[in-house]
Amino acid sequence: MDDSFKKIIKMTEGPDRTAAIAHWLQRLYPEESIPVLVGGSAVELYTGGAYTTGDLDFVGHISPAARKILTETGFTRHGRNWIHEGTKIFLEFPSGSLGEDERKAVLTVGRLRIQIVSPEDLLVDRLAAWKHWESPVDGVNSFLLYRAQSKSFDEDHLEKRTMTEDVQDALYAVRSLYREYTHDLPADKVLEKWSLKVR
């Protein structure tokens, strides 16, 4: 097993470990084909661990070189998932590329640089799941992500994407709750009850 991966699996679960796993995987690729981190693990990194998940989702393809190293490191393929049984690290590759209007970004966590979906596009994805799939956890994720990244959003891109995905009303609800709780986080029960109010 790769020495750097041995160090990673000894880390405490949380955003630092998630970033280390993402960085380890992305180093297996040449710059032009690095898979982009998306989904709940991207929310985890952008929120500094306010939300945590057990799996890492990437947009991209598994190269033959990456497949070989994953297998040698102890990962087993199950469809589009790669699972490391000893540590329960789950890697998923749900699609080959970001959507046409989606952007990638680079997020630095400690000394690690991670290729990740932009915070605006991640927020829109979570808002859409909350509104269209009636997923309360994505409502909570939307609020946590907005709270953590509100000062760094590209507002023009965010507005364009919310219109395209028909989630302006969901964004309005998140902004309203944010204004109410600018200086502190609402209690878990308050946030859960709020997230059940599907747009």
Which residue ranges define each predicted feature?
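Compositionally biased terminal segments of proteins
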Residues: 1-199
